[in-house]
Amino acid sequence: MTRSLKKNPFVANHLLKKINKLNNKAEKEIIVTWSRASTIIPTMIGHTIAIHNGKEHLPIYITDRMVGHKLGEFAPTLNFRGHAKNDNKSRR
């Protein structure tokens, strides 16, 4: 179910403060966050945000096409390595 349009998109307060502080300065720093549920808003465009995937932080550069999506969509948590090639040894 999608979020009601009466409500604003969810962005963690600490993440919003960090982005506003970096927008006031001319410097670009990597913002480290664990908030995968935060929605990407237009003020985040041009920043690099390191999103936690459960093991490490993956740096993701935010573009205009990502606006409206969640941060967690761009940091996959599972790493599928494929099925076993030869399963005959375990069947014996």
UniProtKB/Swiss-Prot annotation:
Q: Which GO terms describe its cellular component?
A: chloroplast; small ribosomal subunit
Q: Where in the cell is it found?
A: Plastid, Chloroplast
GO biological process per UniProt: translation
Q: Which UniProt keywords apply?
A: Chloroplast, Plastid, Ribonucleoprotein, Ribosomal protein, RNA-binding, rRNA-binding
Q: Show the SUPFAM superfamilies listed in the entry.
A: Ribosomal protein S19
Question: What GO MF annotations does this protein's record show?
Answer: rRNA binding; structural constituent of ribosome
Q: Which Gene3D superfamilies match?
A: 30s Ribosomal Protein S19, Chain A
Stated role: Protein S19 forms a complex with S13 that binds strongly to the 16S ribosomal RNA.
Family from the record: Belongs to the universal ribosomal protein uS19 family.
Q: What is this protein called?
A: Small ribosomal subunit protein uS19c
**Organism, scientific name:** Manihot esculenta (Cassava)
